[in-house]
Structures are given as C-alpha cells and as structure tokens.
Amino acid sequence: MKILIISQYFYPENLRINDLVFSLKKRGHQIEVLTGKPNYPKGDYFKDYSWEGPIEEEIKGIKVHRANLILRKKGGGLRLFLNYFSFVFFGLFKILKLKNNFEKVFIYAPSPITVGILGVIAAKKFNCKSYLWVHDLWPESVRVAGGIKSGIILGLVNQMTKLIYR
C-alpha cells in the first residue's frame, strides 16, 4: 500500500512516529514522509540540516520530503506559533508537488493539531482516506494548558479542529 505520512517531526528527531514508519516499511508498504527540518526539542537545526537543505532525502529506504519552517529557538509563544504555522505553509507547497498517487494519508499530531490541515489537503488531492494520530485534543488543550481566554481565538481554533477531526 502507498502511504503518505505527515508529521512535523521525524527521524533523526526521536519520536514514536519513527517506530511506526519503519515498521510499516518492513511490512512491505511503500512509505513517503512529509516532515519539517529536524529541530526538536532544542528549536535549532540538527547537524547537516539548514534552511537550504536537504529538501529531499532517503532514510532506510523511505523517501522523505522536508519542508522549511521557522525555528522556534528559545523564543516564546510567538516563535512557537510561527514554527507550527510555517510548517503548514511550506508543507502545502510540498503536497502540491507530490506526484505519487497515495492510497492512505496518515497524520501524526503530537501537538499542534495544525499539521492536520496538511492531512485534509493531501487526502483531497489523492482522493483517499486520512487517519489522524492526535495526542492533544484541541481546542480544549489550548484553552486549559495554553491559558487562552479570547473567545475569538478559541472560536477560530474550534472551527479549524472541526475541519481536521471530520
């Protein structure tokens, strides 16, 4: 089966999605990953990565498409916001360029749920089902953990999550 995995984070970053991706590959699935440039958890590029590249690479037989993103570095909430949304912005261009006709789209969203936007777009483009592995339930986690009280912001987040969870 041809599967597109979308995750802001992927190898060499150390997250659970790596285990799933490599396991699916071992089971004979054709896997491609759309991800960001590795920078988690410190918020700065890993060795051998930069804004310039690599943009495409192969890791253990898996084609990896790397989207640029704004690094969060040691900045506060604004830098984190820019990091999340820049991955969605640059990831959108990557999806538009993808040629493979995927049968499934799998979205890994430890946080934020914004990566789900790319999954919705990819599933529509490839006319296939998408699956979402979410860790934080938005918008509730934004209100409680994020301390956001603005009705306007929470309303926008609520509309975005309804689109993604659908």
Which residues does each predicted region cover?
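A conserved catalytic-core segment of Leloir-type glycosyltransferases
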Residues: 35-95
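Membrane-proximal helix-turn-helix segments that form the acceptor-binding/catalytic region
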Residues: 114, 121-126, 152-166
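Glycine-rich phosphate-binding loop signature in dinucleotide/nucleotide-binding domains
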Residues: 97-102
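N-terminal subdomain of nucleotide-sugar transferases
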Residues: 1-60
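An aromatic- and histidine-rich active-site surface loop
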Residues: 14, 81-92, 104-128, 132-135, ...
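Hydrophobic/aromatic beta-strand patches that form the interior of the parallel beta-sheet core
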Residues: 4, 32-34, 65, 106, ...
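Short, glycine/serine-rich, charged loops/turns that create anion-binding
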Residues: 10, 38, 71, 112, ...
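Short acidic, glycine/proline-rich loop/turn micro-motifs
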Residues: 75-79, 142-147
